[in-house]
């Protein structure tokens, strides 16, 4: 594995950010190329834990000649957000300079390759240079995984409708509860920007073997060695199934098949009628019935 430290210049003299990129060389040029990043929202750590355990597994496969496809890994995809703290709280989701969500407004390349100019230009915000560079690193890879997490939640993925159910193998390998499917995007999240370029490159819309997704690895506090290893093993199993890593001869565990695949328009954000202290009656992932009480809000205790 080769490790490179790239520099993202800041907006003011003396300020710069380091982007650490790991590259593993595949033995088979025709095998799928893979790009995986985590902590684009810099305060979301489950993906970093998964990467911690995945990297040695891929290094071992590379050393033994079992890594077929080349893999690029960026465990800390947002050094700008990683450095943002306010009164001790980590502010990793939004840029305090531009007030933009770090996973929105990824640049659109034109015929002249303006996105590549952004990556080196001093005339744009460091945040835009970072976003341009991340898109460059993922460019040309048919498998692109962006590891995130929710505030609280179960394991699930976002997937383009055009790649479903072909991407069900990823949901199964990661033991996901659900897959949320989208058919159009307007916020230019990383996943959307990458998929747009996949579509532009695909002859006659042929996306066989492609996978681009945002993976939500449960909640922000779901970070420990057990979960990190489990997620790494799931990612490794997925890469084996896609022909990136040579499959093991030993029997593989049966994969989950009962996850729910639904269009994202079926997801609704519920606005509380009043502020107060919320008491949940169900846990994330539990099935509920119509009319069931899922939470109550304490407005005035006692």
Model-inferred region functions:
Residues 1-302:
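Structured catalytic-domain cores with a bias toward divalent-metal coordination
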